[in-house]
């Protein structure tokens, strides 16, 4: 009888030895819900790459919500990233190469190796074995929901993790494989919906984090979702989804409002796009899904990229399940998730797209050369009219005046304000009314340049500062100084402080004013690299769009 306590104690010790994180002979080992994995060490960080969070969406699982991953018995190697999701072979490099060239730097495009088997994520822990319960930051990469990967080397999370957080980066289905709508898909779905598969992947990854991140030393109740461009849009969209409740506590949105100028496409429009693509791919088949699921994924993506000329097929839609209503209405009605929010933009978001478009499309139209500034700005005004009403033309007079003297800057400023600053300001105000803590920034540190190469703080330029990725091949061409190194450290501290406590401030840094306490206040990461508190984030006419949102009269009716 006396042996019973000993046996019980021994059993508990053996159980803990099998479940608790440990360091094996070749690297750190963690037991997850699907099985055990072995990662590697990167300086002080423990790194785990290529962790499956859902079953491969191949064969009959193409265009279905993500399914649970099959368990494995042996210790799985987690030292190499998983496949990128199928996309244009040039990937992110197609965006960076012409920008680098504009500054006189050579940049070689490296083709992306991708696969339909791509639902993997990566984890960086600041130390091993884990101690305590650390905040978690989950990264959603940008790329218009058509290109990119959470395993891009520019998103290496080790530098951010060193600030005392767990970093997770994920892949999610892209383009036609991630956002395809078709009436037959809706008919076979138990939720009577189609499309939004890439967003369902993101939700599945967040559920994986909820269930497993504790094994890495992370706190499943303190998760910050952060992303850039399309990743930021997706994060803002997920704030409106009932499927995201309790999956994250904070959001950092870099240059991506979840609503903007134009209406959200209807289900009928989205499904019509899908029917057109299906006809292009498999003809008038009586069972188009059977034949579409047999097509090689790369062939399908290539067909859409090269032959389809209709509306964007890589866009989300209000499907009645993931998104019950248009996001703008949910923000305006206060139906969003209760989260802390940080949002911001770069000083000249649109400047790089002129360079990228000209490089991508031979003899691409150059409206700044072929049209006068009046015509160009008027096109913005026509698009903006549903949002700003009769005040539109008066509101943009300053852009027209500026464009007369500096075409590029005038058009860039019009686009920055109308497409990003106004919606982000509305998002900040509506979130503050619902949840409280909101912080807003403007990143204006720019790459030095003259003439046409002076693109300013273009779209995506804050990324190497957030991840301290100046030595990564994507950004090695940047002329980095001690000022940039210091600014990167300050930005990382602000971002991780926010993830820890919902407040980016610390006693040793410039004070970042809270939008919820002083609407319109923000911090500027100024051209000289100094964080400076400011007032007046968006021009006054942006209040018109906010009024329309509140009155349910705006975009996304």
Language-model-detected regions and their locations in the chain:
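Substrate-gating cap/lid region and adjacent catalytic-acid/histidine neighborhood
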Residues: 250, 258-259, 291-294, 298-482, ...
């Amino acid at each position: 009888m006396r042996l019973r306590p000993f046996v019980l104690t021994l059993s508990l010790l053996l159980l803990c030895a099998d479940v608790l994180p440990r360091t094996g002979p070749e690297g750190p080992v963690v037991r997850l819900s699907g099985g055990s994995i072995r990662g590697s060490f990167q300086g002080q960080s423990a790194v785990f790459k290529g962790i499956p969070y859902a079953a491969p969406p191949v064969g009959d699982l193409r265009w279905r919500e993500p399914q649970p991953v099959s368990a494995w018995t042996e210790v799985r190697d987690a030292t190499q990233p998983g496949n990128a999701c199928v996309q244009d072979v040039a990937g992110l490099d197609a965006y960076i190469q012409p920008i680098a060239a504009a500054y006189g730097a050579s940049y070689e495009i490296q083709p992306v190796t991708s696969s339909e088997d791509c639902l993997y994520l990566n984890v960086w822990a600041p130390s091993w074995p884990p101690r305590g319960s650390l905040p978690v930051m989950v990264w959603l990469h940008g790329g218009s929901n058509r290109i990119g990967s959470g395993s891009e080397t520019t998103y290496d999370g080790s530098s951010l993790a060193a600030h005392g957080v767990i970093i997770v980066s994920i892949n999610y289905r892209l383009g036609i494989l991630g956002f395809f709508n078709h009436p037959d898909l809706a008919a076979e779905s138990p939720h009577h919906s189609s499309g939004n598969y890439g967003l369902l992947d993101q939700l599945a990854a967040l559920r994986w984090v909820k269930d497993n991140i504790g094994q890495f030393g992370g706190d499943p109740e303190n998760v910050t979702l952060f992303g850039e461009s399309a990743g930021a849009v997706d994060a803002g969209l997920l704030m409106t989804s009932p499927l995201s409740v309790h999956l994250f506590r904070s959001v950092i949105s870099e240059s991506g409002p979840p609503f903007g100028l134009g209406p959200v496409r209807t289900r009928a429009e989205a499904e019509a796009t899908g029917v057109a693509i299906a006809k292009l791919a498999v003809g008038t088949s009586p069972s188009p899904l059977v034949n579409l699921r047999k097509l090689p994924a790369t062939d399908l993506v290539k067909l859409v990229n090269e032959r389809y000329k209709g509306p964007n097929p890589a866009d989300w839609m209000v499907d009645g399940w993931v998104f019950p209503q248009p996001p703008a209405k949910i923000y305006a009605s206060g139906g969003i998730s209760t989260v802390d929010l940080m949002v911001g933009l770069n000083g000249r978001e649109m400047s790089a797209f002129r360079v990228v478009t000209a490089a991508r499309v031979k003899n691409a139209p150059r409206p700044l050369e072929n049209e006068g500034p009046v015509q160009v700005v008027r096109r913005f005004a026509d698009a903006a009219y549903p949002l700003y009403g009769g005040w539109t033309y008066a509101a943009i007079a300053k852009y027209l005046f500026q464009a007369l003297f500096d075409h590029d800057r005038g058009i860039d400023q019009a686009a920055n304000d109308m497409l990003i600053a106004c919606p982000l300001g509305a998002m900040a105000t509506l979130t503050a009314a619902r949840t409280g803590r909101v912080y807003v920034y403007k990143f204006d540190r720019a790459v030095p340049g003259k003439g046409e190469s002076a693109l300013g703080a273009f779209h995506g330029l804050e990324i190497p500062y957030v991840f301290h990725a100046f030595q990564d091949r994507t950004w090695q061409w940047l002329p980095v100084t001690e000022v940039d190194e210091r600014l990167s450290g300050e930005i990382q501290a602000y971002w991780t402080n926010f993830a820890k406590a919902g407040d980016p401030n610390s006693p040793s840094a410039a004070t970042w004013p809270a939008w919820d306490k002083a609407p319109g206040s923000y911090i500027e990461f100024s051209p000289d690299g100094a964080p400076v508190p400011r007032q007046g984030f968006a021009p006054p006419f942006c209040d018109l769009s906010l009024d329309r949102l509140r009155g349910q009269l705006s975009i996304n009716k």
